[in-house]
Amino acid sequence: MNVNGKAGMLDGVRVLDMTQFEAGPSCTETLAWLGAEVVKIENPKGGDAGRFANTEKPGIDSFYFMQFNSGKKSLTCNLKTDEGVALVKKLVKEANVFIENFAPGVVKRMGLDYEALKKENPNIIYASVKGFAEGSPYEDFLSFDMIGQSAGGVLSITGEPDGKPCKPGVTLADTGTGMLMAITILGALYRQQATGEGEHLQLAMQDAMTQYSRLAYAYRDLNGKAAPRAGPRSFSPAMPPMEFFYVNRAEKMTMYSSLLHGQVIVIGNGFAI
């Protein structure tokens, strides 16, 4: 992919994308934006399930699907047949990255797990996006965005102090996990230049949400209790005041100009313009 007339930063990198919905596709879309050739492998009977999620009109790809799959190529392949599995293994020989976000155990049953594909291409970077990490008591469970946010603690610190836990307006567990996996893949590609070796990368939604919530976990360690919900404010007393305030607009531009060019007001040990 060319960007502004120049080859992308990942020009020459080929990614086999066996992901669906959002957590995986948001990762591979990012790699496509950076110039990688992303080949999306889809079920011949309907393709990625996200193609028809909230479809605005029958017979066309949904807006949801298009938001997470721009810049990709698509290939249909029946993974329930020996021929389909053989095709994927053939494609892996010429790929740099393979990524999947199937339910736990699915790729192994298909014969497309890391150990199987490593035999086809010892240098393959194999990325797995899951809900929960290996060794977790929930490792065999499925996960979608709201589950990932709940398990990672995001919902517990979102909402009003006297209200229920609240889901943020963005799909943080899905796209947030995808972005972290994209960064991890970039690191693996960089290391591969030095070592020539591939590896198996694994990232769980729960772990990603824990990473995004690390200030809340630090609060718990410092105060001996869980960080509270604080609405638009901060749960930390060390943070400056923050909230939504209604203000009247300046009636004349001269008033606004005077404000912008006003004197420095000293506040405690700091200052504000």
Each predicted region: which residue ranges?
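A structured beta-alpha segment of the ubiquitous adenosine-cofactor-binding alpha/beta core
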Residues: N2-N4, L16, S62-K119
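Long amphipathic alpha-helix in the N-terminal Rossmann-like dinucleotide-binding domain
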Residues: W33-V38, N123, M146, Q211-S213
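Conserved small-residue-rich beta-alpha loop and adjacent elements
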Residues: A7-G47
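N-terminal Rossmann-like NAD(P) cofactor-binding subdomain of oxidoreductases
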Residues: T81, E100-S156
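Glycine-rich phosphate-binding loop and adjoining beta1-alpha1-beta2 segment
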Residues: W33-S74
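Structural scaffold positions in well-ordered secondary structure
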Residues: V15, L31, K72, I99, ...
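Acidic, glycine-rich segments within the central catalytic cores of soluble metabolic enzymes
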Residues: A7, A151-I273
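A short, aliphatic-rich alpha-helical micro-motif
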Residues: L10, K89-K93, F141
